[in-house]
Amino acid sequence: GFQADSYIRKKNYCLWGNALYRNGRVKNLKWNETSDWELLYPYLLADSVGGDLSKEIYSFTGGYAARYESITWGGNFSYEASVAYRGIDPRPKNTTSDLSLSLGLSIPVSSSYLFDISVSGRKYKQTNGIKFYSELGVSKVYHLTGLGMHYNRFAGNNYCGGSLGVHTSRSGGFVGNVAYRYFSCEKIISSLNELPMARIGRHTFAGELLYRKSLSGIESWGIKLTGNYELKLGTENIFGDAANQIYPKIGEAEQYSSHAYRLSLSGFYEAVRRKGWNYSVQPRVNYGRVKAEYVYPLREMSVREVTPEVALSVSRMSKDWFLRLEIGGNYAMTFDSRLFHTPSSIDDAALLSAWCYNYKNLSSDYVGYYAVFTCSRQVGKKYLLQLDLKGGQYRYNTDIVATDVCAGLSFLF
């Protein structure tokens, strides 16, 4: 992929922008033919065959911030488009567009603290289709609330959010903020006269409290508590018999719900030593719980997890060079996990097996570790060449091993 960033700072205002193109492939993807599945779950298009999925992403971001006397304000705009496809059966083609806008304001409330407020909005749309060209037949295609092969459209135009916060204008002190976001999305089956099959609503609440203390100008420490709660509700529409290929809506039922909690307590210590050396340590412990329920036929799944982790970093800056190395690791311990379902005549053996396999991995302990290396070299008086290397691995008790390797070369001017 390629990425370009710009930042211009003047006396009373600043501008920034970003442009990105990324081309990649997801290997051996099964039971999901929908892009951005985290956003649209549980109403996904799926099949048991799957395969490699190619994806292209285009992204643009721009922002402006200014200061008038003691008031600071700004805005940020971003747009991302993507296309995902496969050249063999089953052949999904997913196109997405994601437009976001946020505005913020910071006002002093005392000689040491400022009050922050922000609002945001989002427009998201996805067209999700799947086709078969083989003469040997087709595989079964599933909607996770039904089955069949259809041309689907996801359209969401009800995203809004906001946050309130307080931060200090000094190098040490308290920082706090709370935020709320709401997103709704409707699944429409276009081949059935734009039939509105189901809709999903997601409420997200988040909060953060941080304290930072500087010691003699060369050392600092801090502690942070964060919390996040997400409520997701899925409503399925009920239709009568078709007349002239039009299905009348006769009711609706809230069938799916999920509750996700996450608490995190972290700290940091940072020290600046002689000859440009800098050291830091960041311990953290996370607690999370996810509980999902489908009303009829009754199905439940819940997982609790505690994850301690630590990150260590060292860096050195000289006249022309900057070097930084960070290593970290975590260990996730799951407990009190539960899976329950009521046998039903509409059960699908393949889909049920995939669901149980997913639960097995979610309720499995795992260990993860990573390393990040950055090397920057000044070229002339106005340019900088930077190399970034990153590698990590997660090992699950279910014998799954996930490896992540990334390398980047940047030219800054």
Features from the language model and the residues they span:
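Residues that define the transmembrane beta-barrel architecture of outer-membrane proteins
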Residues: G1-F2, S54-F60, K93-L101, G156-G162, ...
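Residues on the lipid-exposed face of transmembrane beta-strands in outer-membrane beta-barrel proteins
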Residues: F2-I8, F60-A66, L101-I107, G162-R170, ...
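Transmembrane beta-strands of outer-membrane beta-barrel proteins
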Residues: Y13-A19, I71-F77, Y113-V119, G172-V178, ...
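Transmembrane beta-strands of outer-membrane beta-barrel pores
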Residues: Y21-R25, A66-S70, Y79-V83, G121-K125, ...
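Outer-membrane beta-barrel translocator domains and adjoining extracellular loop/strand segments
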Residues: N28-T34, Y85-K93, N128-E135, E186-L195, ...
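Short, flexible helix-coil linker/hinge segments at the edges of structured domains or between repeats
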Residues: W31-L44, S118-N158, Y182-R199, F239-I246
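Outer-membrane beta-barrel "beta-signal"
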Residues: S111, V401-F413
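Long, internal scaffold/assembly segments composed of regular secondary structure
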Residues: M149-V285
